[in-house]
Amino acid sequence: MWLFYFYFKPSRKNIETNYMDALNAMLMADKRKAIALLSKIVKKDSEHINAYLQLGNLLREDDPDRAIKIHQMLTVRQNLPKEKKIEILKSLSLDYDKVGDLEKAKIEAEKVLKIDKSNHWASSFLLMIAEK
């Protein structure tokens, strides 16, 4: 049994290579390839928070409801660094803004300010929402 797991366990190096390829595809504006690679990564490694974040961010434009689900799922993760929590909440705020749910976008941005009272992005985003 252990031999089977060891032999078929996803290689961390392979996952990181795929992640770098996905980031490169994003830089080259190959959204389709980036989404495919990121999807492959999260299927192999459900703990790869950065891959989930980037996948949701890429999906926001064409499939914002799916982006919301991905980013919501990340909010329940325990023991994340403060910076990662802020990044997740920011992405979720932008997702809600994309679908026109300004109240939920505001709530998520306010959560950012609860974590970091001087967060410039959250303050600017809340001002932008108030002006809509």
Predicted regions located by residue number:
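Repeat-mediated protein-protein interaction surfaces in helical alpha-solenoids
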Residues: 1-10, 30-38, 66-77, 103-107
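Conserved structural position within tetratricopeptide repeats
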Residues: 40-43, 76, 110-114
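Alpha-helical segment of the N-proximal tetratricopeptide repeat
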Residues: 14-47, 54, 60-69, 91-98
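Long amphipathic alpha-helical scaffold regions
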Residues: 54-84, 132
